[in-house]
Amino acid sequence: MSKRILALEGMSGPPQTRMSVDGKDALVSYVMAGGRNDERNRDIVREVRRDIVPATFGALPDVNAYVTGDAAFTLDVVDFYARGMPQVMAFVLGLSFLLLLVAFRSIVIPIKAILLNLLSTGAAFGLLVLVFQDGRLADQLGFKAGPIESFVPVFIFTILFGLSMDYHVFILTRIKEARDRGLPTGEAVARGIAITSGTITSAAAIMITVFAVFVTLDLVIIKQLGFGLATAVLIDATIVRSMLLPATMRLLGEWNWWLPSFLRWLPEVTIEGDIDEPAAEPAPATA
């Protein structure tokens, strides 16, 4: 086994063996040239687990062999998040679709909301790879280029989806209220954006400032989280919510509120209660 392992590219030095007190267990340690995030080291772990260990111990009864260490642990964590990411996305997207479908009694609005949220998330992921994996701004931000930590995309996706969906529902609620009062969709969009723009901008500015502080810290993982969330909120608040959302609402017009006939049984839901227009000042009494 040692000959085959040491023959792999990236291995260095002879192994060290330690036996347990009862002589039933042995720990054999090998040294690899790269760090735990080195892709070559992950390939070595995969090959040892897939080929070398089964070929060496597979025919021996009552013998268990395990491959551990920093590189093996990192590989297991990466594989865990890779397997779980589709399930997380399916749950978040599916639940968001159902809630928006019931809230706005439209099948177009939830589809459009999910696509817009995925757009801002994808843009954030692209910038994250450009800066941290490709090394752009590495000197300015004070880090060494390397792979994105495996849990960072999952955290960014879930946190950003919650924040952006909150902004989205806030805007759409005001648009729907204006439309329910009889305004055409185009005018309702303009009124909804005018009412919510100040609140959305202020909330986004606060979140961007908070996340940007994370980028100044020394830990690369925190830098990645802060940068990804700050850029995502910036894109979401300035481009997606302020430009793409109202543009698509005006282009689709009344199609925004289309609901198939077989879903007309859905209940009417009021998200934030009825908000009436300000009442007129009472006129002074006259004799």
Where are these regions (language model features)?
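Structured non-transmembrane domains adjacent to transmembrane bundles in polytopic membrane proteins
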Residues: M1-A138, T286
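Alpha-helical membrane-protein architecture signal
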Residues: D70, T74, V78, I107, ...
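Short helical (or helix-break) motifs at transmembrane helix termini and adjacent helical loops
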Residues: T158-A178, I200
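Helix-loop junctions and hydrophobic alpha-helical segments within the transmembrane domains
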Residues: R179-T201
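Membrane-water interface of transmembrane alpha-helices in multipass transporters/channels
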Residues: R105-L115, D134-I156, T216-T231, L244
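Hydrophobic, glycine/alanine-rich multi-pass transmembrane helices and their short helix-loop junctions
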Residues: L95, L99-L101, S197-E254
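Interfacial helix-loop-helix hairpins and adjacent transmembrane helices
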Residues: S242-A287
